[in-house]
Amino acid sequence: PYGHVVAESVEGINTVNGHSYSDPALQSENTNFALLVSNRFTQPFNEPYRYGKHIASLSNMLAGGVLVQRFGDLVSGIRTNEHRMSKSFVRPTLTAAVPGDLSLALPKRQLDDIIEMIYQLDKIAPGTANYDTLLYGAEVKFYSARLALSGELETSLPGFFAVGDGAG
């Protein structure tokens, strides 16, 4: 509840993330949540990080930044434009997002998974699959980041050691 979509930058690529605020002065009327689709690649492919960056960069190429699309337009195969967005009862919290067509930026398999999940969520949270539900893209998470460590787990910062997978 009270969600906001915010811009992030991943190595110069504009992506999105979400926040909810307990401070009433910062709250919105929207609920924000992320639907992330994971990929498990098989050999010979071994560049998941580059693949994710490429997907994120497609929305930047199409919109000059983050794309936003109404769910109903997406499933109808219609590009959301400024006129359609102005008719939406859900107002975007990331006003810099550009109305567009996420199907041009996200691979079909991932898009199908997101659409299916929204329909399933609608069964337990009616209204999730509303025509005016807003989808932003792209949000990417990289869980394969690797730190350069010495044999003693020391980073390039002298006296600074790291353990774990680095995702948190």
Language-model-derived ranges and their functions:
Residues 1-168:
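Residues forming the flavin
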